[in-house]
């Protein structure tokens, strides 16, 4: 089993558990150059809010898009957008990535901006 398939297996197991809970989830995806965050409806069929380092509004404030500062900016942006739509409580779906580095920076920034998870 290679690294990617192990991550996908971990993500599938976590998503199955989150689906049982029926909670709105904050999903994170990480690539070497960018980080993406989406708030997805409990049924899994609708993206309610999204933010990423690909967006021009976020990228203009950053020097580089693949570091912890960029992840924190995305976390803050997705939390602010979720709060505008009335979403206050989410479940954190790290997509099988370790809760460390950029994933942790995004989560901490989202919590500081007012999201609860």
From Swiss-Prot:
SUPFAM superfamilies per UniProt: Translational machinery components
GO cellular component, one term: cytosolic large ribosomal subunit
Any Pfam family hit: Ribosomal_L18p
CDD domains: Ribosomal_L18_L5e
InterPro entries to which the protein is assigned, alphabetical: Ribosomal_uL18_bac-type, Ribosomal_uL18_bac/euk
GO MF annotation list: 5S rRNA binding; structural constituent of ribosome
Top-rank taxon: Bacteria
Any GO BP: translation
Assembly and binders: Part of the 50S ribosomal subunit; part of the 5S rRNA/L5/L18/L25 subcomplex. Contacts the 5S and 23S rRNAs.
Function: This is one of the proteins that bind and probably mediate the attachment of the 5S RNA into the large ribosomal subunit, where it forms part of the central protuberance.
Family from the record: Belongs to the universal ribosomal protein uL18 family.
Stated name of the protein: Large ribosomal subunit protein uL18
């Amino acid at each position: 089993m290679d690294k990617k398939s192990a991550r996908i297996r971990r993500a599938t197991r976590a998503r199955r558990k989150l689906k049982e809970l029926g909670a709105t989830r904050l999903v994170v995806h990480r690539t070497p150059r960018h980080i993406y965050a989406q708030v997805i409806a409990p049924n899994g069929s609708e993206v309610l809010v999204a933010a990423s380092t690909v967006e021009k509004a976020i990228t203009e404030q950053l020097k580089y898009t693949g570091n912890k500062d960029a992840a924190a900016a995305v976390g803050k942006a997705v939390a602010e957008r979720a709060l505008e739509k009335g979403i206050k409580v989410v479940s954190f779906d790290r997509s099988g990535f370790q809760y460390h580095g950029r994933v942790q920076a995004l989560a901490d920034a989202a919590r500081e901006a007012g999201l609860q998870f």
